Structure formats: C-alpha cells, structure tokens
C-alpha cells in the first residue's frame, strides 16, 4: 500500500519495494510476494533466474517459476526483474564474456515475455564498460514497454582494481571515482536511450549535496536503500542521518521510488517482527523482517508538507514542453485569457506599482484638479484596466483610461466589462494595434503586460518602442525595465523528449516548461536588459552577450542539456515581478521558465567553466535568438538566422 497520504502527490514515489536477496526457486515466488504485500510493501525487486545458471547448448533457462504462478497484472505491477549479478560483459575471460551476453539477452527476453515494466541491470564492474553498453544498446533497440534500470552506487568509491596501477604513476589522478561518470559513459554509449534509466544504491556514506544534486536531472527511477545505511535511535529502531533524510525527501519530490535492500540489522520486537529472514513465508501473520525500515520510510514520507495549491495546479505541466505564445502574430483564445486573469498576485503587484506612480505623479494638493491620463496597451479582456481603476480609487486620484487592444474578440469582452462596471465615463476602448494607433493626447502613465518567460521573448521591447510616442517626456512606463537570466541545467527528460522528434529544428526551439526533473548546475546570470521609456528609441533591440558559468568544485563533472531562462521586471521603483529563482514573486503562475536546448549535450569536467553566447536578432518581420557554447567544447550555433524558431512581428 502507499507510504501514506500526502495531499496533491499522485507520483510513483508513494510506493516502496523490497529487494529479494535469495533466489525464490520453484513455487516460492507467490508466497514471497504475498508476504511482502501483506507487510505493506508494494513490489519486489526479484531475480528471475537461478544465479548459478550458466548457458550451455540446448539448456533451458532455470527461471524462478513458470509465468503461470502469478497473474499478468501481478507480474506487471508487483515485480521488477533483477538481472543476474555475475554477468560481466567486459571481462577479459572470453567465455565469461560470451556467457554473460547470452544470459543477459535471455533474461531480458524472459522479462519482456512476463510484461514486466522494468529490469535492474547489475552495475558496471569496471570503469571501462563499452561492451556492456554495446549489448544493452542492442537490446534497447528491440524493446517497447520495458525499461532497463542501470544500478549505480551513490558514493565516492575507491578506484577500481584495474585502475590502481595507473594511479600509482600519476600523482595528479584523483584517489576517488565518481560513480556518476560510470552512468554518463554508459548513457552516452547507449545514445541517450529514453528506456535506459538509473537505480541508485544508497549506502551509509554520501557525496556532497552539490554532487547529489546532479542526479535530480537524470532519469533516476529507484533509490535502493541499503539497511546498513540506517542508524539506530535511542529506542533501538532504524533511522537515517539528516543528510540521508534530506536526500530521501528530494527523491520523493522527484517521483523516485524507494526499494529497501539488505538483511535486518535491527532486532525490533514489534508484532512478531523477525530479526533475520526477509523472505520468510511460513506465517503470514508475522511481519516482514524489513518492516521497521519500511515504517521509517513511511514516517519520512508522511511528515512532508502537502504540495502547495499552486504545485497541485501545475503538476500536470511538469517537464511538459510547450511552444511560447506568439501574441503579436496570433490572437489569444478565451481560455488563455482566463488562465492569466486568475493570477491575482500579478495584478496585485501591478496595482501597487500604478498606485505608487499615481501618488508620485499627482500630489495630495492637486488631486481635485488633476486628471492622470493612463494608457493600457495590450488591454486584453481588462484585468489591467481594473487594476488601474482600483489603484486610482485607493489613492484618491482621478484617472482617464485608454484601453488599446488589437484582438477584436477580446475587445467584445472588454466592452461588456466596461458596461457592466459602469466605467463608460472613465475608459475609452481602442480596437487597434498599438503600433498603428494615433493617440489624441499624451499619456502620463503607460501600462502593459507584454512580458514573456524570458522577459523580451514576446516582443515587449518592439511593442513599447512603438507605443512610446504616446508618452509624455516625463511619463512613466510600467514596467520600467526587465532583465532576462539563464543558468545551465541537466535535464535528461527534456532532452529525450526533444530527441524523439528526430530533427534539428526541435533542438533549435525555445520551450516554455514547468521545470521539475532538472539539476541546476550554477547560479543564474543576467543576459539582456531593456528599459522603458527607451532612452534611445531609434536604437536597435538586437543584443549579444557572453557568459561564463563556474560550477562548484564539489559538484564534480556534469552534463549540460541546455539553459533554463527566467526574467525579473521592475514595474515601478521597488515593485518588481519575476520568476528568476532567487527573487521570484511568490505564488504567481502566469509564467513558466523557458528552456534553450543543446543539440548535443556538453560534458563539463570537474573544475571547468562553461562559456555560452546568446544573441537577440531582429529582422524586418521577425525576432529570434541564437545560442552557442564555446567552452569546454564548442557546439554549433543554434537557430542560425532564425531558421527553426522565431517570434513574428
């Protein structure tokens, strides 16, 4: 059964499995499964084949049991296959290498026959695992519904035996091996297959938090938690260190399932808990030997805070790639307007900014004689009109509003709103593109909500430059400035989703995405800034910048799949709005981050900076971005001349 109820969480991380250490021969598997399920485990990680088996001509695979001992739903829902651990496809012994290849293919074929959802592959036995990866890659090309989880120890381990001799002669060589490197090498050899995932062995010691953080951008499906990783509390029960608890919470938040593995190291006498045999099946009333460990895992899960309401709303958008809006080329639909209008935080910030501007514009002595002219450019269905009039009421200032909107469908709704609220004497509706309209008078305040996830990516600079002629020389623009930011990320899922399109164009497109399964590798840095009113209205809005990101040394090596983009806007003075992680406006959902992918992920060795170049390019009919990495290795210039992705003027 699930570890517990956590409001809003429907992910697979609610389910906990147990590793079967001994081969359940003959008809034992149903009893082992029944005992585990009755003890509140949800599935087994179980060997499918006798570990003593070696292939011989004409031999029959000594499987754990006939496929008939469990029903199809039980095989699919409650069994994860464990491939024989003796398999060594990079052994120097040729016979062992050949036997390993035959057995691996036989076991995967049997798992496919059983309709298992996943099989766990044994960890690489040495740093060089090219033949292992080659055989697995062959197998992956023939699989449809079966995932292969490569087992990787989550530790900074000593060098493998074959590497010791070389280390003696190289004083610069590190005395530790980063197990992430094993995974990365294997994944690259297998061409980033979306069906190749990771099962992390969590031991008693852990690398640094920065090093651990890399794994949240990788396709980790399970954390195999060893019983020797547990400590003992004052009452004799198993517990985890603070660092292990934090890691476990991170796994739960990233939909990673926990599998408990090992022998019981705690003699907990509670309801007949056994102290030794985790496969005991004789008395179903007796709790599983590893139940105390499961109880503790459930305790960690249940004490997590419920998912915030905003996260629950956004959960179905996690890591889902969307094309950015084209508000100039396209007219937004009613549903899109409605979604944005529900973002009360955004309009509260706008109202605060407008109120401050009104107070600065009109002194208390002049409130009865001065009427402020305010233009909302891109009025949509009227939320900024409402915010402006509420700010005027709040500050006691008189206001004359022009609502300029190019979408004729939105104008219909805008007319209805004005009539319903009785604002006919206060608001003049202009059905026109702001770049074409000739205003009858100059504005004191120009208000717009033309910002995209990257700040300028929905052409706010071009629109506001065109509307700036409406503004008095000392007029106020809200927003007054905005800055874009980027950071390098590991995002294996996003990369594989784009790769599935099998073309270059999708790798040269920027996507709006609710980032979830990612690893943030370095702090954000600013890219482009635009100010309004524009002090040089005739200057080009083209931009170019070069940035260098330093990845913390303790992180180790990493793989960069692309760059996450954000913005921060100054609406007026100290009132800001944005999604840049360090300064993000809380509880605002109008914008997800933007993602700029790389056609080929960039491997970044430890202690090596990343150098990236970004261009904002402008043509007669479109605006587009180009981007490229030049260090530690050069990438192609993405989206050259806007060939794959652009925003139409």
From Swiss-Prot:
A protein binds at residues 340, 449, 458. Residues 10-300 are annotated as: TIM barrel. S-adenosyl-L-methionine binds at residues 337, 346-347, 405, 433-434. The record marks 340 as: Critical for specifying symmetric addition of methyl groups. The lineage of its organism: Eukaryota, Viridiplantae, Streptophyta, Embryophyta, Tracheophyta. The active site is at residues 449, 458. This is Protein arginine N-methyltransferase 5. Its main location: cytoplasm. Belongs to the class I-like SAM-binding methyltransferase superfamily. Protein arginine N-methyltransferase family. InterPro entries: Arg_MeTrfase, Arg_MeTrfase_PRMT5, PRMT5, PRMT5_C, PRMT5_TIM, SAM-dependent_MTases_sf. It is an enzyme of class 2 (transferase). It comes from the Eukaryota. Methylates arginine residues in proteins such as histone H4. One of its GO terms (biological process) is methylation. GO terms for cellular component: cytosol; nucleus. It catalyses: L-arginyl-[protein] + 2 S-adenosyl-L-methionine = N(omega),N(omega)'-dimethyl-L-arginyl-[protein] + 2 S-adenosyl-L-homocysteine + 2 H(+). Its EC number is 2.1.1.320. One of its GO terms (molecular function) is histone arginine N-methyltransferase activity. Pfam families: PRMT5, PRMT5_C, PRMT5_TIM. SUPFAM superfamilies: S-adenosyl-L-methionine-dependent methyltransferases.
């Amino acid at each position: 059964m699930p570890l517990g109820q956590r409001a809003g969480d429907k992910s697979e991380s609610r389910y906990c499995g147990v590793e079967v250490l001994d081969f359940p021969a003959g008809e034992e598997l149903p009893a082992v499964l029944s005992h585990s399920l009755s003890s509140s485990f949800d599935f087994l990680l179980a060997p499918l084949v006798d570990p003593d088996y070696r292939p011989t001509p004409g031999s029959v695979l000594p499987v754990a049991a006939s496929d008939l001992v469990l029903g199809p739903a039980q095989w699919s829902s409650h069994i994860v296959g464990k491939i024989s651990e003796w398999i060594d496809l990079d052994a120097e012994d040729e016979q062992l290498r050949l036997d390993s290849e035959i057995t691996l293919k036989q076991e995967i074929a049997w798992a496919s026959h059983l309709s298992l959802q996943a099989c766990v592959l044994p960890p690489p036995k040495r740093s060089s695992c090219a033949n292992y990866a080659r055989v697995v890659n062959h197998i992956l090309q023939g699989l449809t519904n079966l995932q292969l989880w490569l087992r990787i120890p989550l530790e900074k381990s000593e060098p493998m035996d074959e590497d010791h001799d070389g280390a003696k002669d190289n004083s610069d060589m590190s005395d530790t091996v980063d197990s992430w490197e094993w995974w990365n090498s294997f994944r690259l050899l297998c061409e980033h297959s979306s069906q190749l995932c990771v099962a992390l062995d969590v031991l008693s010691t852990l690398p640094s938090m920065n090093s651990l953080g890399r794994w949240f951008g990788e396709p980790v499906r399970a954390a195999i938690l060893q019983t020797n990783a547990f400590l003992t509390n004052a009452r004799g029960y198993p517990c985890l260190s603070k660092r292990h608890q934090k890691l476990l919470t991170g796994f739960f938040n990233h939909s990673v399932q926990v599998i408990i593995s090992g022998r019981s190291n705690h003699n907990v006498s509670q309801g007949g808990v056994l102290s030794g045999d985790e496969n005991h099946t004789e008395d179903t009333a007796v709790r599983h030997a590893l139940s105390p460990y499961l109880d503790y895992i459930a305790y960690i899960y249940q004490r997590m805070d419920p998912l915030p309401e905003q996260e629950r709303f956004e959960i179905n958008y996690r890591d889902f790639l969307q094309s950015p809006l084209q508000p100039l080329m396209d007219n937004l639909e009613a549903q899109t307007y409605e979604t944005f209008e529900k973002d009360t935080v955004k309009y509260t910030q706008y109202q605060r900014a407008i109120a401050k501007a009104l107070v600065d514009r009109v002194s208390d002595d002049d409130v009865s004689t001065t009427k402020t002219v305010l233009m909302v450019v891109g009025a949509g269905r009227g939320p900024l009109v409402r915010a402006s009039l509420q700010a005027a009421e709040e500050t006691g200032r008189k206001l004359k509003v022009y609502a300029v909107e190019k979408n004729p469908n939105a104008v219909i709704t805008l007319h209805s709103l004005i009539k319903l609220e009785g604002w006919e004497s206060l608001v003049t509706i202009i059905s026109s593109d702001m770049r074409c309209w000739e205003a009858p008078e100059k504005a004191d305040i120009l208000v717009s909500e033309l910002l995209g996830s990257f700040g300028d990516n929905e052409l706010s600079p071009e629109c506001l430059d065109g509307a700036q002629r409406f503004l008095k020389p000392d007029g106020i623009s809200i927003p007054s400035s905005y800055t874009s930011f980027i950071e390098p990320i590991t995002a294996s899922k996003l990369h594989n989703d784009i790769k599935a399109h099998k073309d270059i164009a999708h790798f040269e497109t920027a996507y709006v995405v609710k980032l979830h399964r990612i690893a943030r590798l370095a702090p954000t840095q600013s890219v482009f800034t635009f100010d309004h009113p524009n002090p040089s209205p005739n200057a080009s809005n083209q931009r170019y910048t070069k940035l260098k990101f330093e990845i913390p040394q303790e992180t180790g090596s990493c793989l960069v799949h692309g760059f996450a983009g954000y913005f921060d806007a100054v609406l007026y003075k100290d009132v800001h709005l944005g999604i840049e992680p360090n300064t993000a406006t809380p509880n605002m959902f109008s914008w997800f981050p933007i993602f700029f992918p790389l056609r080929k992920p960039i491997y970044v060795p430890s202690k090596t900076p990343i150098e990236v170049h970004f261009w904002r390019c402008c043509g007669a009919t479109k605006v587009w971005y180009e981007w490229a990495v030049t260090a530690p290795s050069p990438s192609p210039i993405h989206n050259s001349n806007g060939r794959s992705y652009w925003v139409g003027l």
